[in-house]
């Protein structure tokens, strides 16, 4: 894969992931405001964004077998707890 393609897919994955969570947050607000149809619409859009993001992630070759996926999850969560958030706290 060309470097520019990889960078574009990575940026698209980040954008789709953020949109997915943003629309779920919007759905939560719509539920709190008793607008179930609007909430349903936001959840449908969130699902579409999730599908887009997963497709980008697959194209990047970042979805592996179960053992590798579990290790990636452990590594990511460990990094957040041991390094990322402590660094944020020290700023």
What does each model-identified segment do?
Residues 1-91:
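Non-heme di-metal
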